[in-house]
């Protein structure tokens, strides 16, 4: 068991860390983010006080995002994710948790090529299997949120 643990630990590569602001609802607070490649996923650990909230992006066999409220909790699919490029904020599950992460958003813009250039907002709603069901951009995200609330 220890040998397999060591092997998986060796596969982790820290990409960056930053001190930033996180938010739950209307309450903002300082937090630290560590982004790490772990095997075939990229994990983002958000630390504030004695708490850690983590999200991971999995690309294969399809893009999905999972989160967990602490290191002892299991991973579960997020319901939705939104990006506001103007405020440099990424939010999950109807803004239950948000983080200002300009490093991640710069990567999104670079890796998306022309598709995201000039965009102010992007959003995704995930199905029960974690796969993207609906994607929106700019005013379409506002319209989608209005439709969901009705």
Task: Please name every model-derived segment.
Residues 12-150:
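Cysteine-centric segments in proteins
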Residues 1-4:
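Bacterial N-terminal signal peptides
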Residues 7-9:
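N-terminal signal peptide c-region/cleavage motif recognized by signal peptidases
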């Amino acid at each position: 068991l220890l040998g397999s643990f060591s092997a998986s630990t060796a596969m982790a590569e820290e990409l960056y860390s930053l001190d930033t602001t996180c938010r739950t609802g209307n309450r903002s607070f300082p937090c630290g983010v560590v982004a790490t490649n772990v095997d075939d996923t990229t994990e983002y650990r958000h630390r504030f006080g004695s708490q850690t909230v983590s999200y991971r992006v999995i690309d294969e066999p399809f893009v999905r995002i999972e989160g967990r409220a602490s290191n002892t909790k299991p991973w579960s699919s997020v319901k939705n994710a939104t990006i506001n490029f103007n405020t440099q904020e990424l939010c999950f599950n109807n803004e239950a948790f948000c983080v200002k992460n300009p490093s991640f958003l710069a990567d999104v813009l670079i890796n998306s090529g022309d598709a995201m250039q000039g965009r102010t907002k992007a959003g995704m709603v995930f199905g029960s299997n974690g796969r993207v069901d609906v994607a929106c951009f700019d005013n379409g995200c506002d319209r989608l949120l209005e439709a969901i609330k009705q």
